[in-house]
Amino acid sequence: MVREEVAGSTQTLQWKCVESRVDSKRLYYGRFILSPLRKGQADTVGIALRRALLGEIEGTCITRAKFGSVPHEYSTIAGIEESVQEILLNLKEIVLRSNLYGVRDASICVKGPRYITAQDIILPPSVEIVDTAQPIANLTEPIDFCIDLQIKRDRGYQTELRKNYQDGSYPIDAVSMPVRNVNYSIFSCGNGNEKHEILFLEIWTNGSLTPKEALYEASRNLIDLFLPFLHAEEEGTSFEENKNRFTPPPFTFKKRLTNLKKNKKGIPLNCIFIDQLELTSRTYNCLKRANIHTLLDLLSKTEEDLLRIDSFRMEDRKHIWDTLEKHLPIDLLKNKLSF
């Protein structure tokens, strides 16, 4: 695609998946192109997407394992071929797929002799295993073997200090990085002032999500990162009138909690879960990540608390309040604050 002029192209950017394949259960590959881009834009987009794909995509993994009567992680257990450390390393490699937030419990409880694989993990309903054949341990004798596990959804690489826990549990260095690798290349075409660039993007994932899903999530995260600048202008922020500092419009949920209690003392706020409020999936996930599970949790937060939540946007707060006004059987309009 060729632009008529460099400074003001009327052509719309288009992207396309040109190749997609599954090399194994834990290795997906996708190749995408984006064009036409002006000179330098492909590098800007490529760098931003690569960083977002490798560092901002959330993944689910096992973060802790608890053994019974094991003095330290370098111990061996009678009747098991692998040491405790080797079992922990095998658990670290297990690839999980889920949309859960917070910590969940799982377990393994089997009787030998037999091989233990990922298929033997007893998981909560919201979690599934990508490759059930992943090895964990080999029981060589007829023994009962049980492990309690903790599962968490996070992003990036999380490490914990190694120490002996009295309850027999050991932390696992969690690698919550579903995207295994990202490459990008740039192809220039056209002549003279009609030159433009094509961005080629290659993505490899661990099978917990497809490269296309990873690209969508990374793009969404980048958009959310820049939205505050757009909303500042939309809300009429005047930097000339506020030369010294910027004060966001007042929005304190604590005041509304007081009003709520005044108008409807009988409402059990701690029994109303945010799942019942018909929030968008994006807003719901933001709140769950911040351990906000009930209406009481939500209404106890200030605007500053909410805006500190990762990926929480200005428009999310308005959506939350609009939803409360629509569905709660009380008159909250009296103390409603303007946006």
From Swiss-Prot:
Signal peptide (from-to): none
Q: How does it assemble?
A: In plastids the minimal PEP RNA polymerase catalytic core is composed of four subunits: alpha, beta, beta', and beta''. When a (nuclear-encoded) sigma factor is associated with the core the holoenzyme is formed, which can initiate transcription.
Stored NCBIfam families: rpoA
The record's listing under InterPro entries reads: DNA-dir_RNA_pol_insert, DNA-dir_RNA_pol_RpoA/D/Rpb3, DNA-dir_RpoA, RBP11-like, RNAP_asu_C, RNApol_insert_sf
Reaction it catalyzes: RNA(n) + a ribonucleoside 5'-triphosphate = RNA(n+1) + diphosphate
Q: What is this protein called?
A: DNA-directed RNA polymerase subunit alpha
Q: Where is this region: Alpha N-terminal domain (alpha-NTD)?
A: 1-233
Which EC number applies?
2.7.7.6
Annotated membrane-spanning segments are: none
The family assignment reads: Belongs to the RNA polymerase alpha chain family.
Where found in the cell? Plastid, Chloroplast
